[in-house]
Swiss-Prot record:
The complex is composed of two ATP-binding proteins (MetN), two transmembrane proteins (MetI) and a solute-binding protein (MetQ). GO terms for cellular component: plasma membrane. Keywords: Amino-acid transport, ATP-binding, Cell membrane, Membrane, Nucleotide-binding, Translocase, Transport. The gene is metN1. SUPFAM superfamilies: ACT-like, P-loop containing nucleoside triphosphate hydrolases. CDD domains: ABC_MetN_methionine_transporter. GO terms for molecular function: ABC-type D-methionine transporter activity; ATP binding; ATP hydrolysis activity. It comes from Staphylococcus aureus (strain N315). It catalyses: L-methionine(out) + ATP + H2O = L-methionine(in) + ADP + phosphate + H(+); D-methionine(out) + ATP + H2O = D-methionine(in) + ADP + phosphate + H(+). Belongs to the ABC transporter superfamily. Methionine importer (TC 3.A.1.24) family. InterPro entries: AAA+_ATPase (IPR003593), ABC_transporter-like_ATP-bd (IPR003439), ABC_transporter-like_CS (IPR017871), ACT-like_dom_sf (IPR045865), MetN_ABC (IPR041701), MetN_ABC_transporter-like (IPR050086), NIL_domain (IPR018449), P-loop_NTPase (IPR027417). Residues 2-241 form the ABC transporter domain. Part of the ABC transporter complex MetNIQ involved in methionine import. Responsible for energy coupling to the transport system. This is Methionine import ATP-binding protein MetN 1.
Length: 341
């Protein structure tokens, strides 16, 4: 649906060149809720602006719904933009217009009939739960209600793609949760592909099925949300995951336990998925290795509606200890594991 092929974007300020994007490649599939996460300045917003051609790539290709828009003119983009809706952090509503007129604005600009406008706007306001607010003005609404108006406006043209640029950053946690539920409903009800730009890993965890992690203009990691949460490969991805889920004990706790440890030991970090959470893993391991197994840390969470568990295990070892059977057990049970040294 959206594909970036070795995309770079540079800005020239005075005599300085700023590389906002460097060799970015990934694909957003049809019906995805795809998250792009990174700290401020990572290039996230620049990336999303390439999709609706608010910016043009310096190098590479941007493919939208089968069209290479890299070198499209503004005229050439008109039809493509009809299939793209966008919502922003600060809503971008017209304060002098009613909720109804704000939602209707794209249809008014497209010169649709009054009958069509009324029908379509009424449908969208009902969908976002604001039918009773149609005659009010933005200043009379809460932040969550304003974002619902913005979502209705973005959907009123029946787009194939919805771009969300930090759409929940200005909202409190409870309102954020309700907006994410609404966006998930948008995806499921209308089959709209959603691209979420955010710096909040909780947003990725709660709504997205796939994610790209950005740092300094580059995509440093991509994968399903479950993959990235279960085994983040890069330091920045690990840091983002740790803001939502504690996946391992603190360094101070490990240091204290190591100081108290008598004899040799070997530690494993394991990731247990929902189908395995209720299995007697510790009991199995004790029987396999014939020795004590300690749980130094355990944390459960829900990802994509599935319960998962992170554990840090310690085996007391001696010269006769052989980890072959333990490693084989993890592999047979499809338990992701990592030896900690």
């Amino acid at each position: 649906m959206i594909e970036f092929r070795q995309v770079s974007k540079s800005f020239h300020k005075k005599k300085q060149t700023i590389d906002a994007l460097k060799d970015v490649s990934f694909t957003v599939n049809r019906n995805d809720i795809f998250g792009v996460i990174g700290y401020s300045g990572a290039g996230k917003s620049t990336l999303v602006r390439l999709v609706n051609h608010l910016e043009a790539a310096s190098n590479g290709q941007v493919i939208v719904d089968g069209h290479d828009i890299t070198n499209y003119s503004e005229k050439g983009m008109r039809e493509i933009k009809k299939d793209i809706g966008m919502i922003f952090q600060h809503f971008n509503l017209l304060n002098s217009a009613t909720v109804f007129k704000n939602v209707a604005m794209p249809l008014i600009l497209s010169k649709k009939s009054k009958t069509e406008i009324k029908q379509r706007v009424t449908e969208m306001l009902e969908f976002v739960g604001l039918s009773d607010k149609k005659d009010q003005f933005p200043d009379e609404l809460s932040g969550g209600q304003k974002q619902r108006v913005a979502i209705a406006r973005a959907l009123v043209t029946n787009p194939k793609i919805l771009l969300c640029d930090e759409a929940t950053s200005a909202l409190d946690p409870a309102t954020t949760a309700s907006i994410l539920t609404l966006l998930k409903n948008v995806n499921q009800t209308f089959g709209i592909t959603i691209m979420m730009i955010t710096h909040e890993m909780r947003v990725i965890k709660d709504i997205c099925n796939r994610v790209a992690v950005m740092e300094k203009g580059q995509v440093v990691e991509t994968g399903t949300v479950k993959e990235v949460f279960s085994h983040p490969k890069t330091t920045i991805a690990q840091n983002f995951v740790s803001t939502v889920i504690q996946t391992e004990p603190s360094t101070s706790l490990i240091r204290r336990l190591n100081d108290e440890q008598v004899g040799g030991f070997k530690d494993y970090k394991i990731f247990v998925e929902e189908t395995q959470v209720t299995q007697p893993i510790i009991n199995d391991l004790i029987q396999i290795c014939g020795r004590e197994v300690k749980i130094l840390f355990s944390s459960m969470s829900e990802i994509q509606g599935n319960t998962v568990c992170y554990m840090w295990l310690r085996f007391n070892i001696d010269q006769q200890f052989d980890d072959t059977a333990i490693n084989q057990y993890f592999k047979e049970k499809n338990i992701q594991f990592e030896e900690v040294h």
